[in-house]
Amino acid sequence: MLVAADGAGSVCRQLLSVPVTQQHSDEVSMAFCLTLSVPHQQRAWQRFTQQGTLAILPMREANQVRLVWTCSAALAQDVVGWQPEQWVQHVNSVYRGYCPAVVSARLLQQFPLRISQASRQHVGRCLLMGNAARTFYPTTAQGFNLALRDVAALAQLLVQAKQNQRAIDATLIAEFVAWRQPDQTRVMQITAAMNTVFGLQLPGWSVLRGLGLSAVELVPFLKPRLAQRLLGYSGRVPD
């Protein structure tokens, strides 16, 4: 079998003639390399602001992290022209009290945000995985987490097939797709909803949003249920 995990511009997907539905956005994601004042201890942080969504992800080096800042194209055009000191100042103002202080920042790249979905996930014994199959809003690392669950599920099926001396054929791959599709659809819906909820700037909306977040925090069953869905523990999960 062929597992195609070659990214959003997948050459394998093109060679397989799998159509892709794309939803273009007026948003841009910018990636920065940040240096923290103290080690990150493998923690990640995300903030939703009026200037967009900012996610900080730990890297291998103890004090190095990546910042992915998703915002409107108009704002991004201004931000890329800032001096490094301005990036540091803005990130520290957004994350004050939530994560270690940023001492330096360097812009790595920027790219337009596109939401895409392949019309099918497999052709025969060829399987599309990760961004080759779908891309969506970069919210709470859900795309990465989903890909890890997909890989774990595929590995489980392949191990079971070998143990049972079963052929690794199109039928087995179809079983994988049927298993994983509900989780994939759920994550796409959740990330789209979160982007809408935190992106709207209507009068009074921030108050309603705050009340909703307070309800999640206070109502006993809401927070665990939401966490289960975001962590991928709802429905059938890989062993």
Predicted regions and their residues:
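Short amphipathic alpha-helical/adjacent loop interface patches that line ligand
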Residues: 9, 27, 148-151, 180, ...
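Residue-level signal for pocket-adjacent positions within structured domains
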Residues: 7, 15, 29, 40-43, ...
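C-terminal helical "tail/cap" subdomain of flavin- and related membrane-associated enzymes
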Residues: 156-239
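FAD/FMN-dependent oxidoreductases across multiple families
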Residues: 77-168
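Conserved FAD-binding catalytic core of PHBH/FMO-like flavoproteins
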Residues: 1-108
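Gly/Ser/Thr-rich helix-start
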Residues: 8, 18, 53, 131, ...
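A generic short alpha-helical patch detector that favors 3-5-residue windows
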Residues: 22, 121, 146, 182-186
